[in-house]
Amino acid sequence: MSWVQVNLLVRSLSRGWGGLCRPALSGTPFAQVSLQALRGLHCSAATHKDEPWLVPRPPEPQRKPIKVPAMHEDLFKPSGNRERDKASFLNAVRSFGAHNVRKRGHVDFIYLALRKMPEFGVERDLSVYNLLLDVFPKEVFRPRNVIQRIFVHYPRQQECGVAVLEQMERHGVMPSAETEFLLIQIFGRKSYPMLKFLRMKLWFTRFKNINPYPVPRDLPQDPLDLAKLGLRHMEPDLSAKVTVYQMSLPSDSTGMEDPTQPHIVGIQSPDQQAALARHNPSRPVFVEGPFPLWLRNKCVYYHILRADLPPPEEEKVEEIPEEWELYYPQKLDLEYSRSGWDDYEFDVDEVTEGPVFAMCMAGAHDQATLIKWIQGLQETNPTLAQIPVVFRLARSTGELLTTSRLEGQSPPHSPPKGPEEDDETIQAEQQQGQS
């Protein structure tokens, strides 16, 4: 830079700073100082506008046209009359590797494949997850030195690998040795996906059989079999008997008296039958429900037949024979060396409820269907004929019905509703009842 250019630059800067310092020293208000400063700086900028060679601008880089990536959605669209099954999903994953040799956009493709897995029914297949991990390029994302190990090396790719393992964990898929080999080959041993794999390998083996009442992985598709499974899952007594009171008619049945006949399945144990036989006929029993029960990803609804807690004067204390006390003592008075500060009782909030006499699952939750269930229970429980029944359903107010009305009255069925509309109505009415 020549002396002439330096001189011009210093003069322009002195003009700007002079406009700032001179009014401040003379006691000018702050608003006027800022205004004068802006004017001085504006004038200096105007003088340099005619001299572009003083402050040269860097050349703007040429913007390349953005390449729109190929839409991966087309790979998962079934061609022709093919169904959405495992074969079509594997074909889509393999076609991505065949058409895209350099595997550009593989992270977006893997995220899309994870979202599409439930549609193809392969969210519980280990081989499909291993095939998705095989989409990653090998030996590229492994850290090579200490600095790369300290900082997250290729974070977006590691997050995608962790997302694959998290979906496996969500669906209860145990990773195998092939999964470990792929993770080491892709990300190395010192990586977040490998750390996630080690944690899954540790805790999956410990929590695999933690549920004392396991539910089968593949649930039956028939509503009747699903109802039997749900009732067996709720009833702790193994001697309880499952009874089918009414079978559902097929959808193409015509010319029948009741074309909308739903299924009715009930369960009752011998102890419940004995408790119902000892029930006071002057006190009513209640049919309550429907209550939800989740069996993995399916929700079924059940009803119960219960009674209120009897008053203390009507409770009968069962005497335990002395022979039972010898083999199965009910009370143990063992004196250990304890001080007066020891608490012999635990703080447990126990709420005593009335007895439950039976449970059922039906294809419809209206009063007409549950009346047929009560009529079926009267065949094995004769004392139920002298006990009034009160229906406390979520969609109706309680109505007192005696046995004579149950036998002589057969209300017409309500128009059939779809399962989604039926579930939404039940949930809405349950919320209204709670409020």
Curated annotation (Swiss-Prot):
**Keyword set, alphabetical order:** Cytoplasm, Immunity, Innate immunity, Isopeptide bond, Mitochondrion, Nucleus, Transit peptide, Ubl conjugation
Q: List the disulfide bonds.
A: none
- Its protein name is Evolutionarily conserved signaling intermediate in Toll pathway, mitochondrial
Q: Which family does it belong to?
A: Belongs to the ECSIT family.
Record's superkingdom?
Answer: Eukaryota
* Organism name: Mus musculus
Q: What InterPro entries has UniProt attached to this entry?
A: ECIST_C, ECSIT, ECSIT_N
Can you list the GO cellular component terms from the UniProt entry?
A: cytoplasm; mitochondrion; nucleus; transcription regulator complex
**Cross-link of type Glycyl lysine isopeptide (Lys-Gly) (interchain with G-Cter in ubiquitin): positions?**
372
GO molecular function per UniProt: chromatin binding; DNA-binding transcription factor activity
What do we know about how this protein assembles, alone or with others? Interacts with MAP3K1, SMAD4 and TRAF6. Interacts with SMAD1 only after BMP4-treatment. Part of the mitochondrial complex I assembly/MCIA complex that comprises at least the core subunits TMEM126B, NDUFAF1, ECSIT and ACAD9 and complement subunits such as COA1 and TMEM186. Interacts with NDUFAF1. Interacts with ACAD9. Interacts with TRIM59. Interacts with TMEM70 and TMEM242. Interacts (when ubiquitinated) with NF-kappa-B subunits RELA and NFKB1. Interacts with RIGI, IFIT1 and MAVS; these interactions promote RLR-mediated type I IFN induction.
Q: Where is the transit peptide?
A: 1-48
| Gene Ontology BP term (one) | regulation of transcription by RNA polymerase II
The record's region (Disordered) falls at 401-435
Intracellular or extracellular location(s): Cytoplasm; Nucleus; Mitochondrion
* Deletion consequences: Macrophages lacking ECSIT exhibit profound disruption of mitochondrial complex I/CI. Deletion lead to increased dependence on glycolysis and mitochondrial respiratory chain dysfunction.
Pfam families recorded: ECSIT_C, ECSIT_N
